[in-house]
Amino acid sequence: MNFQPVDRLPVWEWAMWWDKTIARWHGEGLPRELKFGQVFEIAQYFGLDPYQQFWFSTTQATIEATQHHTEGMVGSMDDYLSIRPKLYPDHSQAIAGMRPWAARQAQGEAVVWVTLEGFFWFPRTLMDFERLSYAYYDEPELVHRINQDLLDFNLRLLEQIAKSCVPTFMTIAEDMSYNNGPMISQPTFEEFLAPYYRKLIARAKELNLLTIVDTDGEVTMLVPWLQAVGVDGVLPLERQAGVDGNQLRRLHPNLRMVGHYNKLVMHQGEAAIRAEFERLRPLMKSGGFIPSVDHQTPPGVSLEEYRLYVRILKEYMVTAAH
C-alpha cells in the first residue's frame, strides 16, 4: 500500500462473507465447524492471508456489536443527553485481547486492523438519515456535540490501543455515499465532519496508521474531500455504483484503494472472473491497491465458484505485482 515493489499483492478479503453464503457453502462441503463470523478461521481454510479486525462500537463493549437498537432515538439535544451515559463504552477488555495479535503481527503471521465509527455514521445511527439531514440546518449544535464526543472517544481509544497493539491500518466506518455520489454536500462536510477528521487523522498519523474510509457507493466526488483532511484511502469501491478505480488513480496518484472486484461476476465462470482481474490489472500494477470483493461474496456464488475465484486471485496477486 506504500507504492513499493513487492513479491506479490495480499490475498485478502476485507469483508466477511454473508451469513447466507456460509449457510449455502455448508451444504456444498464447507466444514460445519466454520461458522459465520469466524473470519480468521474461514480465511485460513481458503488459504487467504490472515487478518484480525477489531471494531470498537460506540454502544457496546463488544467487537462487531450491532447498533440497531439505538437507530433513530435522538431527535433533540435532550434526547442525546438522556442516552449519552449509555454510549461510549469501556473497551479495555477488548483492547487487552489485542496483545496476542500484536505478537502475531510482529512475526508476519497476521495483519491487525481497527475500525472506528465516523462522523457521519454515528450521528446517522443515533438520529436516522432524515433527522440528521434536517439537524445540519435546524440543530447544528447537536451534531457538533455528538461529533465532539465521538472524537474524544475515538482519541481515547487510539491511546489505549497503542499500548496493546499498533495496528497496520485503521478504517473509519461512514457509508456516506450512494450510487450518485455523497449523501451530503461539501459545505456540510467541511462544517460538520472535517474539523473532527483532521484531529483524528493527525493522531493516527503520529501512530503511523494508514487511514482508510469505508464508504459504499460512488466515491469519486468524495475522495478529494477526504484527502484534504488527511485520509489515505477508501474502500470498497463498488463497481455497480459506477466507481472507476483506474480513473481514480489518474485523478489521485497517491490514493490507497481496497476492493473494486465486481462481486456480480463471480458466478459467471472462469472467463468472466479473469476478465474482471484484467480490468484491475493496471490498478494493481500502479501500487497502493489491494483487489478484493467489492462488498461481501453473495450467496449466489457456490463454494466451487469461490474456490475458482480464490485460485485465480492468487495467480494475479503474483503476476500483477511484476
Residue ranges and their predicted role:
Residues I42-A65:
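Glycine-rich, N-terminal phosphate-binding loop and its surrounding beta-alpha-beta segment
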